């Protein structure tokens, strides 16, 4: 079970601890908060149908004191441009400077596939030597033909073996994801 620790709007207010962290990032509305709730088996993270609701860095801990971080989504958000720029700077600062960060979990909506922004992020993470896990979310929304099309597109990008297909709603592959994340904390 995950427990909410705190929200942070800048590096001075980050959660101060000596453990490693796993962060969750992706475009707005891909299901980051829903996934955290699914991992927790409780509604520990606020969920919204409106893109861009998560605007702070949210820190959570599990019973073993492992730290999970929910980052705001990139892409669409309903906020003034200067506030959006400040939020993106906050995310960049966390990703580039956070010493506790061990693994980045990049979520993308399986209905949309991996978009250019996602590919840019994957390339940045690889160049920065960041450990990255890719999750295709909302897999329950796809029929068999759409799943096949997604897998073909992932194969074309050479990513078919490194993407886990998940559904927070149906809990598809959530237990496999928990095992994968547990191994990252070791």
Curated annotation (Swiss-Prot):
It comes from Mycoplasmopsis pulmonis (strain UAB CTIP). Keywords: Cell cycle, Cell division, GTP-binding, Magnesium, Metal-binding, Nucleotide-binding, Septation. GTP binds at residues 26-33, 52-56, 70-73, 137-140, 166-168. One of its GO terms (molecular function) is metal ion binding. Mg(2+) binds at residues 33, 54. Its cofactor is Mg(2+). CDD domains: YihA_EngB. Transmembrane segments: none annotated. PANTHER family: ENGB-TYPE G DOMAIN-CONTAINING PROTEIN, MSS1/TRME-RELATED GTP-BINDING PROTEIN. One of its GO terms (biological process) is division septum assembly. This is Probable GTP-binding protein EngB. GO terms for cellular component: cytosol. InterPro entries: G_ENGB_dom (IPR030393), GTP-bd (IPR006073), GTP-bd_ribosome_bio_YsxC (IPR019987), P-loop_NTPase (IPR027417), Small_GTP-bd (IPR005225). Residues 18-186 form the EngB-type G domain. Belongs to the TRAFAC class TrmE-Era-EngA-EngB-Septin-like GTPase superfamily. EngB GTPase family. Necessary for normal cell division and for the maintenance of normal septation.
């Amino acid at each position: 079970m995950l427990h909410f620790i705190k929200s942070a709007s800048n590096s001075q207010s980050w959660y101060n601890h000596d453990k490693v962290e796993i962060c969750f990032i992706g475009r707005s509305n891909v299901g980051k908060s829903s996934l955290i709730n699914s991992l927790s088996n409780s509604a520990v993270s606020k969920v919204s149908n409106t893109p861009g609701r998560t605007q702070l860095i949210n820190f959570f801990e599990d019973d073993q004191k492992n730290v999970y971080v929910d980052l705001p989504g990139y892409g669409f958000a309903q906020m003034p441009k200067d506030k959006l720029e400040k939020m993106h700077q906050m995310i960049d600062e966390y990703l580039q400077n956070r010493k506790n960060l061990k693994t980045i979990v990049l979520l993308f909506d399986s209905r949309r596939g991996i978009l250019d922004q996602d590919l840019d992020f994957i390339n940045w993470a690889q160049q920065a030597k960041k450990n990255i896990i890719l999750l295709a979310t909302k897999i329950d929304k796809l029929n068999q033909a759409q799943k096949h099309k997604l897998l073909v597109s992932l194969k074309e990008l050479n990513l078919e073996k490194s993407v886990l297909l998940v559904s927070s709603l149906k809990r598809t592959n959530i237990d496999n994801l928990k095992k994968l994340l547990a191994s990252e904390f070791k």
